[in-house]
Swiss-Prot record:
This is Ribonuclease P protein component. One of its GO terms (molecular function) is tRNA binding. Consists of a catalytic RNA component (M1 or rnpB) and a protein subunit. Its EC number is 3.1.26.5. RNaseP catalyzes the removal of the 5'-leader sequence from pre-tRNA to produce the mature 5'-terminus. It can also cleave other RNA substrates such as 4.5S RNA. The protein component plays an auxiliary but essential role in vivo by binding to the 5'-leader sequence and broadening the substrate specificity of the ribozyme. SUPFAM superfamilies: Ribosomal protein S5 domain 2-like. Residues 1-20 are annotated as: Disordered. It catalyses: Endonucleolytic cleavage of RNA, removing 5'-extranucleotides from tRNA precursor. It comes from the Bacteria. It holds the Pfam family Ribonuclease_P.
Amino acid sequence: MLPAQHRMTRSTEFGATVSKGTRAAQPDVVVYRLRSDQTADPGPRVGLIVSKAVGNAVQRHRVSRRLRHAALAVLEDLDPSDRVVIRALPRSRDAVTPRLEQELRTALERIRQRTGAPS
């Protein structure tokens, strides 16, 4: 389970990250990352977007659990000021957790290369 301090819950955070953040697409997910300029951040925050295009409620919930698990695995690689939104694509309903984690790591690495950020 993703700790509460690392969960993105406000729609304004989601909106800012998606609209102003750097995007990297993978076959099963699209990842957006934005560096926050707030200095009192408790750590990186991660949000999930799993739309009805992914499948029915059971499938969406399964994908959400897998993505949360993958996000937890990469949490220590993120900077405390990072805001990350993971958008699940319809193909993600058939993806296993290790594949989602690998795609998340690949997407974050591509974003790092584009922005020139050290971490």
